Amino acid sequence: MSCKVLEELEEVIRRRIEEGNPESYTYRLYSSGIPHIARKVGEEAVEAAVAAIAEGRERLAEEAADLLYHLLVLLNAAGLSLRDVCNVLEKRRK
């Protein structure tokens, strides 16, 4: 399974965190800590669920993109990567 844009997004997230620019939303989110990031992931998951029920496919895709972005930031903050998640999925597939 491969999704190049997610790998590229993960790299952008890493770079923005390393740069430490306080004007960067990614850096500010990362700096807020895991509990705050986890709440954002929860909020985005709820928004995606609502979009699936009541707002249509296009809106669901947009909310899913937001959810994936925030999840990648959370994974980074926890010392994990998209590769770590893919490894788990590959093991479960067998």
UniProtKB/Swiss-Prot annotation:
Gene3D superfamilies in the cross-refs: MazG-like
Organism of this sequence: Pyrobaculum arsenaticum (strain DSM 13514 / JCM 11321 / PZ6)
CDD domains: NTP-PPase_HisIE_like
Keywords attached to this entry: Amino-acid biosynthesis, ATP-binding, Cytoplasm, Histidine biosynthesis, Hydrolase, Nucleotide-binding
Gene name of the encoded protein: hisE
Compartment annotation: Cytoplasm
Chemical reaction(s) catalysed: 1-(5-phospho-beta-D-ribosyl)-ATP + H2O = 1-(5-phospho-beta-D-ribosyl)-5'-AMP + diphosphate + H(+)
Gene Ontology biological process: L-histidine biosynthetic process
The protein's name: Phosphoribosyl-ATP pyrophosphatase
NCBIfam families: histidine_hisI
Pathway the protein takes part in: Amino-acid biosynthesis; L-histidine biosynthesis; L-histidine from 5-phospho-alpha-D-ribose 1-diphosphate: step 2/9
Single GO cellular component term: cytoplasm
